[in-house]
Structure formats: C-alpha cells, structure tokens
C-alpha cells in the first residue's frame, strides 16, 4: 500500500500589470524576456505557481515560477513571451 503524501497539487496564478512589473531578464530571445527574476511580495506564492503579466487584455508573459529564494522568484516563458527584455 503506498504511503500517503502531504503535497499540495493546486497552483495559483499571480497576475501583474505589465506597467507595474519590475524584473530582471535573465535570458532573452529575439528581444523578449524568456526567463525573469522578480521580487515576490506575496508570501503565499510558491514554486509551481504561474506568473501572468498582462498589458490590457494582452498576455505578455505566461510561465511557471520554478524557484523562489531570498524573496526573489524566477519564472520561465520560453515559447510565447512578449515581454520586452529591457531593464525594469
């Protein structure tokens, strides 16, 4: 009989307006940020959650948060990022 595991399988989506999103582009492709580092201000945000950056009704970035360390998160959107890779 398998042991029961105490793992939460639900993830949440962190939605941020593109105008207010401050980040560092760790990787980029064709001028768009594909891996970003950003300050995590909500203590409920966990690795595995989704980061969604919106500009009006347009999705600029949609990716999983892979790591959170010392209050900073790293998220990846390697396929569809429209987030300009400029210093914010």
Description of each model-found segment:
Residues 40-55:
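Short coil-to-beta transition motif at edge beta-strands of beta-rich domains
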Residues 16-33:
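Short, basic/aromatic beta-hairpin or loop at an interaction surface
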Residues 70-81:
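Short, solvent-exposed secondary-structure boundary/capping segments
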Residues 56-60:
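Short, charged beta-turn/beta-strand-edge "cap" motif at the junction between a beta-strand
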Residues 1-21:
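N-terminal helix initiation/capping motif
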Residues 33-41:
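Short alpha-helix capping/helix-loop boundary micro-motifs
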Residues 83-88:
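A short macromolecule-binding patch
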Residues 61-68:
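Short beta-strand-centered aromatic/proline hotspots
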């Amino acid at each position: 009989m398998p042991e029961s595991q105490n793992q939460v399988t639900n993830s949440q989506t962190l939605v941020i307006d593109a105008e207010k999103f401050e980040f560092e582009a760790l990787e980029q492709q064709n001028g768009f940020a594909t891996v970003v580092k950003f300050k995590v201000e909500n203590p409920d945000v966990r690795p595995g959650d989704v980061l969604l950056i919106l500009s009006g009704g347009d999705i600029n970035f949609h990716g999983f948060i892979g790591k959170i360390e010392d209050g900073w998160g790293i998220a990846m959107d390697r396929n569809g990022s429209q987030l300009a890779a400029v210093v914010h």
